[in-house]
Amino acid sequence: MKEAKVENIDFGNALSERYLAYALSTIMSRSLPDVRDGLKPVHRRLLYAMLQLRLEPNSGYKKCARVVGDVIGKYHPHGDVAVYDTLVRLAQHFSLRYPLIDGQGNFGSIDGDNAAAMRYTESRMTDICTLLMEDIDKDTVDFRPTYDGSDLEPVIMPASFPNLLANGSEGIAVGMATNIPPHNLHELCDALIHLINHPKAEINDIINFVKGPDFPTGGIIIDKAEVINAAYTTGRGSLRVRSRWEKEELSYGTYQIVVTEIPYQVQKSKLIEQIAILLKDKKIPLVSNIRDESTDIIRLVIEPRDRGCDPQIVMESLFKLTNLESRIQLNMNVIGSNNVPRVMNILEILQEFLYHRQNIVTRRSTYLLNKIKHRLEILKGLRIAYLNLDEIIKIIREEDEPKAIMMEWFKLTEIQVEAILNTRLRSLRKLEEQEIINEHSNLQKQQAILEEILNNPKELWKIVKKEIKTVQTKFGLNTVIGARRTSFEEVTLTNQVVDITAFITKEPITIICSKMGWVRSLKGHNTDLSTIKYKEGDAEKFILEAYTTDKILIVSSEGRFFTLLADNISKGKGTGESIKLLVDIGNNDITNILVYKPDQLLLLASSVGKGFLVNSNEVMAQTKTGKQIMNVPDGHVCIACLPVNGDSIACIGESRKLLVFNIDEIPEMKKGQGVTLQKFKNAKLLDIKIFNKEDGLGWNNNGKVKLEKNIVAFLGKRGSTGKLPPMGFPKNNRFSSY
């Protein structure tokens, strides 16, 4: 038994070499398309297997299981699921702009539904698909052995149409990815013809023909032309695509919005689910309902909350929050004709395709020319045989080795003699000289044409252009499949916030928040608080009279502000809903709840004894996570947020020292810790109060309201320690004993 040979190598180098081999295999054999035919190896093998099965567009369908079996058995030694998924995608009209496979059965839906099992579905090639493999039998492309060496497969497809840009491609390899959107074939053909006529054309010339992507699902590209041009010039970028919608008038002045097209690669079911979640979370108050009325065409019906809602504003709010507006990435990373992957711009991709077509036409012409020369040689021999028919027949009948004798006597070549000997005697007798002469003459004309094509580049490019025009005519803008589906409409995005309160009926409400953080609203003002019920162990904390159109500010003990629309607060006489469901307040307490008023000054104070004034406009939060305004040190909390409705402020803390000073001494800030309000030593600030000096300082002690007019003794500068409060001040060191 032979001993295993062990070779000592550096582990890092070995790992590096193997990973590099894996990466190259992934890039070259799986993830990136070839710039010439726009296909990956699995696509190429699948389509070639269908060609071998003769699944022509005018033939019958065959079970997909048969096709997949041939692919994995002969060409692609991978899982059947991966191959079938590829087949399904090539047949989906919402995935490919120009489907390559004609499927029969359930091939999935735009909702994201899976296709039926391969044993139930059937398929065949489309007319577009046949163009990819046109003339493949005329030595136009190289073939290589399959994985087991038992058969041959094409290295590349002849590709009579620019499949890479027409159908697009996407894939992720090791360290690189590609994402090429589909385009309109008619426009691509125009660009190719222009490039043939003007070989030195620049990208800007090409962009005049190719305006932008053309998605199978339609939609509207809303980016400016400059953005699209920049993406095509660099080969990288992104484009924004919006759904197409229309306003549908109903009776009594009402209307509904109907979405007829959605962005490319957006699943309709997930889009509806996304909108439904926003409806449930009350994030889109201008929308009351959404329903799916789609059949074989998209029809999403969106009902506005009120007939007075501007449909444009409704849709703008949906575009911002949902996939009704989507961003399509563009990264034209492909494998070039030199087998090197790189990012190409649109001009380079079109040039590579034209060079490929030039090579295909050259190889095809050479192949046909050789076939004609071969036939002409045979015809020359057949004519000699016709002129010496009796002698030929006699030699064939009487001689054991007629081949050598015929070559010697009649100066025939081996090919000519083989052709004569392979012809039946009966057929030899029926030979007519004129037929031979006519065929010989026609072939000579074809030979002259082919030689002109091969010897004259202008003639060759004429053929390339003619074939591109043929494709354009067959699948142009005037055809059902060729008409442009995606349109362009420049939209300038603004940061303007839609005032949704304009569409809410203004009604008085009373907002109730309990100590445990349960919030609700009741209709009207002057509510009988004795009828309000709370959960066991809970009680009232804040009672706030407001209107449904108001915005409510919630201040947490960590100094973070949250904003709620009053109309979105749970209504009814139940216990309401937890504030944690409405905002991300975490385990922090609620310091205060108040109605937002524009340009109102608010006083913030923390238990560390610091505070500052802030404009109410600065504390408005746009998200559920809120906005951090006051920075509170560890171990301390924000104890107060009060509207400034007086000229003086009173502070008191654990040290039971009362300090009164002018509110003008406190600076206005946007955020921060603030300045020292009252000085403490090993104590915390417990409460503050804003009041007018003329009215005096009041407090509530066990239900008795006390007003102190003489506050001179407690006056001081901001940052002082203060003095003991007057007799009768609450023992809890707060301005209310409750």
UniProtKB/Swiss-Prot annotation:
The residue ranges of the Topo IIA-type catalytic domain are: 32-496
Q: Which cysteines are joined by disulfide bonds?
A: none
SMART domains, from UniProt? TOP4c
Enzyme nomenclature, EC number: 5.6.2.2
Q: Which Pfam families match?
A: DNA_gyraseA_C, DNA_topoisoIV
Q: Which Gene3D superfamilies match?
A: 3.30.1360.40, DNA gyrase/topoisomerase IV, subunit A, C-terminal, Topoisomerase II, domain 5, Topoisomerase, domain 3
Q: What processes does the entry annotate via GO biological process terms? A: chromosome segregation; DNA topological change
- Its biological function? Topoisomerase IV is essential for chromosome segregation. It relaxes supercoiled DNA. Performs the decatenation events required during the replication of a circular DNA molecule.
Q: Name one GO cellular component term.
A: extrinsic component of plasma membrane
Site entry: Transition state stabilizer: 119
- Write out the GO MF terms: ATP binding; DNA binding; DNA topoisomerase type II (double strand cut, ATP-hydrolyzing) activity
Entries under InterPro entries matching the protein? GyrA/parC_rep, Gyrase/topoIV_suA_C, Topo_IIA-like_dom_sf, Topo_IIA_A/C_ab, Topo_IIA_A_a_sf, Topo_IIA_dom_A, TopoIV_A_Gneg, Type_II_DNA_Topoisomerases
What does the record say about its membrane topology? Peripheral membrane protein
Which stretch is the leader sequence?
none
What high-level taxonomic lineage is stated for the organism?
Answer: Bacteria, Pseudomonadati, Pseudomonadota, Alphaproteobacteria, Rickettsiales
Q: Which keywords accompany this UniProt record?
A: Cell membrane, DNA-binding, Isomerase, Membrane, Topoisomerase
* Cellular localization per UniProt: Cell membrane
Q: Which residues form the active site?
A: 120
Which PROSITE patterns does the record cross-reference, listed alphabetically? TOPO_IIA
Q: Where is this site: Interaction with DNA?
A: 40, 76, 78
Catalyzed reactions per annotation: ATP-dependent breakage, passage and rejoining of double-stranded DNA
Q: Which family does it belong to?
A: Belongs to the type II topoisomerase GyrA/ParC subunit family. ParC type 1 subfamily.
Its top-level enzyme class, in one word, is isomerase
The protein here is known as DNA topoisomerase 4 subunit A
Query: Which NCBIfam families does UniProt cross-reference here?
Result: parC_Gneg, PRK05561.1
